[in-house]
Amino acid sequence: TLIGTTESEYTGGLAHPSITAAEQAYLLDMASRYFQRDLGVHDVVWTFAGLRPLLAASLDDPKSVTRDYVIDFDRSGPPLLSMYGGKLTTYRKLAEQVVDLLAPALGLASSAWTGAIPLPGGDMPDGDFAGFLAQAQVSHGWLAPTLLHRYARAYGTRIGRLLAGCSQVTDLGEEVLPGLYAQEIHYLRTVEFARTAQDILYRRSKLGVHLAADSEKTLDEWLA
């Protein structure tokens, strides 16, 4: 279960923000209201923190802070577009508005299209995952069912690209961590731009949540 978020003013270094003890206690207290027992720090298997800029209409009034983004498009000279704020849940809307503003300046035609286009790997017929998984079991029956299901859920129709050249488990290469083979690592680095163990274990997947505490160190050493 993923719980969050908190909103606290942050004054530390920008490179490696982390959750504070007070924020963790707040989230555990809030979540405990919905469980039969109280949650404690020992129940937490992973935490992450991020920072986002917020715009205030008045520095004297914290309530004036907006969680939305602001686009400033200066047409007085060469087109200059600046974006402020924004969040994960509005990234697509923001990107479409930016492209719509910039396209005419670049002599390009543009209209919103992302709402009707599936994400990479999501182009399975009629969005039928069960049918897709059944076909994958025929094509890649040599894989353990749990591993095949994870690949199908994570990569969708790109599973063929992930498993290109593989017809048996040994073709996946070294099992660097439980359930994580060299073949998948190579795919994530070359196709999904992963660079570090943290990229692979948390940003491209959530495998790190279910692995031993030293898994990130083990993978970083393997990647070196």
Task: Please state what every model-predicted region is.
Residues 1-3, 7-223:
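C-terminal catalytic lobe of FAD-dependent flavoproteins
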